[in-house]
Amino acid sequence: MRFQVEREVLAEGIGWVARGLAVRPSVPILSGVVVNAEGDTLTLSGFDYEVSTRVELKANVEESGTVLIPGRRLADIAKVLPDVPIEFNVDQTKVYVQCDSNSFVLNALPLDEYPTLPKLPTVCGSVEGDQFARAVSQVAVVASRDDALPVLTGIGVNFDGEIMKLNATDRYRFAIRELAWKPEGTPSSSSVLVPARTLLDFAKSLNKGDLVKIALSDEGNLLGLHAGTRQMTCRLLEGTLPDYEKLFPKEFTSFGAVEVSRLVEALKRVSLVLERNSSVALDFTDGELVLQAGGADDDRATSRMAASLEGESIDIAFNPSFLLDGLTNLDASWAQFSFTSSNGKAVIMGKSSVDAEADTSARYLVMPVRFHR
């Protein structure tokens, strides 16, 4: 088995596949990446029984074949080699890597012990890659990282006719993003729960102009995604997220609007005096928003800015990190805050100007916290 591949091409491809490998696999063989060279294509595949990844790369194949190589080690090597073609020669159990004046000899892993990768399920529709990647990043930020509650580490993907709804929560905030997709056949309704980290990693790998094909197994336990030369399958999480339709308020007492960039900068400034897990108070009055951080006996900071308010004045406090996550993921220059009361949950949406209608396709619910003055 012998082939050549551009270093940059290999580094990008093996880097993506290797990220999907378990850091401490339950079975050592799962640390490997299957490398198949045939025709003018190099195919890299990884699998850990939960997630499978596959990418095709252009290569100059002199002798076809298949070998199992330690994935993370190959990724580390490809990352640091000079930017010239890399030559691979495989001789039984040894993999010889040559790049310019640098050479490595790697021990191949036993290919016959490697599990069979799952096939891509039946494609049920497609979505524009740019929109999908942005939507995933907007909701993934609120997914829990606590594996003690696996259901909260997922992103709910709801298919409702020609609308796809992504949603995630960590119990303290809830993000929803709606976007158009093209179902194959008769549009129907279904819901799946996908590991957030896996979905986000695939979204980050998308290239501009990619069309993402979405596939679901008939058993409803496997999701497949295919875009360009990349393919991924992952086992779905069991359970369901809370019903966001019941959590998001239907009626509000006040609506505040403020420029996103000014509020983000102000939050970062006043947060400098805060200890961990402290809150920032937002005092909305007609024409002004006042931010306060710190208590009477602590370091304090205040920032004022122009804002609009419809309805009752609001004096409310939030975790500043949660606010920043919501604000920085708005694709808008203005943020609209919809309040139920000074002690109730708030909903943040983007808008193009102070007088424009809010964009309801991206909604961010955040719970208030107590502020000690």
From Swiss-Prot:
Any GO BP annotation: response to antibiotic
GO terms of molecular function: 3'-5' exonuclease activity; DNA binding; DNA-directed DNA polymerase activity
UniProt keyword list: Antibiotic resistance, Cytoplasm, DNA replication, DNA-binding, DNA-directed DNA polymerase, Nucleotidyltransferase, Transferase
Keyword Nucleotidyltransferase tagged: yes
GO cellular component, one term: cytoplasm
Broad class of the protein's primary localization: cytoplasm
Pfam families named among the record's database cross-references: DNA_pol3_beta, DNA_pol3_beta_2, DNA_pol3_beta_3
Keyword NAD in record: no
Subcellular location as annotated: Cytoplasm
Superkingdom of the source species: Bacteria
Family of this protein: Belongs to the beta sliding clamp family.
Assembly with partners or alone: Forms a ring-shaped head-to-tail homodimer around DNA which binds and tethers DNA polymerases and other proteins to the DNA. The DNA replisome complex has a single clamp-loading complex (3 tau and 1 each of delta, delta', psi and chi subunits) which binds 3 Pol III cores (1 core on the leading strand and 2 on the lagging strand) each with a beta sliding clamp dimer. Additional proteins in the replisome are other copies of gamma, psi and chi, Ssb, DNA helicase and RNA primase.
Stated role: A homolog of the beta sliding clamp protein encoded within the biosynthetic cluster for griselimycin synthesis. Upon expression in S.coelicolor A3(2), which is susceptible to this antibiotic, confers resistance to griselimycin. The beta sliding clamp confers DNA tethering and processivity to DNA polymerases and other proteins. Acts as a clamp, forming a ring around DNA (a reaction catalyzed by the clamp-loading complex) which diffuses in an ATP-independent manner freely and bidirectionally along dsDNA.
Protein name: Beta sliding clamp homolog GriR
Organism of origin: Streptomyces muensis
Organismal lineage: Bacteria, Bacillati, Actinomycetota, Actinomycetes, Kitasatosporales
